[in-house]
A protein has these predicted regions:
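Nucleotide-activated sugar donor-binding and catalytic core shared by glycosyltransferases
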Residues: 1-378
Length: 378
């Protein structure tokens, strides 16, 4: 069978690569063609575009690159029609993928499977109409999405477990590098580590990293280690950390979290990864026009939280400094509460255990692959 996959960011590349491996187990003759990244390419198949050509966020960035986005979308539509896959698999990235779903539904008879649901429970809930009309099967990775889709909107979905939890479990089972070995390999001293996870897109990194570094530097008895995002070159980071005391690791985020004492994390999948490694964290997300964004967030968002940790727990487990609450001083204040072995740190770690329990121990890649192959072969 032939599978056409589309992702738009680094986390999607990771999750899709695991799904592709699982699809190959269920369908050894599977062929892949995709918009994706290096991890998907390592599994095999034909990459027609790198996700970096799609990964624009924010109104200004999208407008500046609108011609590129529209050109890629037109190419994607033509490519699907010409290749004639047995299924189109969309992974998150709804701004692009829902338009592709509409096209495929209206112009072909190819089934559309959505892996990692658009977060319409947070905003743009009206998109449920598009999903119902254009998506044949939706595979969810967040437990609270089940009542949202099935009870509120009467749209049956598959909850398959969480791929991040699966990936963390697999890594921890195989990883055996000691703290001493990790420090020696990366030229670190014996001080405890503050991990900096500043996002996977250049706009995010530029908006968050400088103040994250400034806040963390207030704690001289700790050393700062930055997890570089895949696809972002060293020269880009040098503009923010060149010649400073910030160490950089590349392609070793999970190894860093295995040895970190605490972390500053840009909102996204990384907040859940950090929690699953049981590293206390402060969630940070800077925006342009923070006061306006803070007001619009209160006005438009339908959820109380932005981090997956708090959304899954349905309460505040980790502090969120977003838009108008994001500042060097606020980051430092929240970080200070977590560094000693005090009550705030212990309460956060207890909250992490609650998140683990709610996610469960299913293997989402395998469950999703089995369902997809079964439906395609009908």
């Amino acid at each position: 069978m032939k599978y056409y996959l589309i992702v738009g960011e680094a986390s999607g590349d990771l999750h899709a690569s695991h799904l592709m491996k699982a699809l190959l187990k269920e369908d050894p003759k599977a062929e892949f063609r995709f918009f994706g990244g290096d991890m998907m390419s390592a599994v095999g198949g034909t990459r027609v575009r790198h996700y970096r050509e799609l990964a624009y966020m924010g109104i200004i960035a999208v407008l500046l690159h609108l011609r590129t986005i529209l050109r890629n979308m037109a190419f994607c539509k033509r490519d699907i029609v010409e290749w004639r896959p047995d299924a189109v698999i969309l992974v998150d990235y709804p701004g692009f993928n829902l338009k592709i779903a509409k096209f495929v539904h209206e112009h072909t008879k190819i089934p559309v499977y959505y892996y990692i649901s658009p977060k319409i429970w947070a905003w743009k809930e009206y998109r449920i109409k598009e999903i119902k009309r254009n998506v044949d099967e939706l595979f969810s990775i967040l437990p609270f999405e089940v009542p949202f889709f099935e009870q509120k909107h009467h749209y049956p979905i598959h909850y398959v477990g969480n791929p991040t939890a699966e990936e963390v479990r697999q890594f921890r089972a195989a990883y055996n590098v000691s703290g001493e070995e990790f420090r020696h390999e990366h030229g670190l001293d014996e001080r405890p580590i503050i991990a900096l996870l500043a996002g996977s897109r250049k706009q995010e990194i530029a908006g968050n990293l400088p103040q994250m570094i400034a806040a963390a530097r207030r704690f001289g008895s700790y050393q700062l280690v930055l997890a570089a995002a895949p696809g972002i070159d060293a020269e880009f980071y040098d503009a923010f950390i060149g010649g400073s005391d910030v160490h950089v690791v590349r392609g070793e985020t999970y190894a860093l979290l295995s040895h970190a004492d605490t972390a500053l994390v840009t909102s996204g999948t990384a907040t859940l990864e950090t929690a699953l490694f049981r590293v206390p964290q402060v969630v940070c997300y800077n925006t342009a026009l923070p006061k306006l964004v803070g007001f619009l967030r209160r006005l438009m968002l339908k959820v109380k939280y932005v981090s997956l940790v708090n959304l899954i727990a349905d309460r505040e487990v980790v502090p969120e400094l977003v838009a108008n609450t994001f500042s060097e001083a606020n980051i430092a204040e929240q970080l200070k509460r977590l560094l000693p072995d005090g009550a705030a740190r212990r309460e956060m770690l207890e909250g992490y255990e609650e998140v683990w329990r709610k996610i469960g121990e299913d293997s989402p890649s395998e469950r999703t692959a089995k369902e997809m192959v079964l439906k395609v072969k009908k």
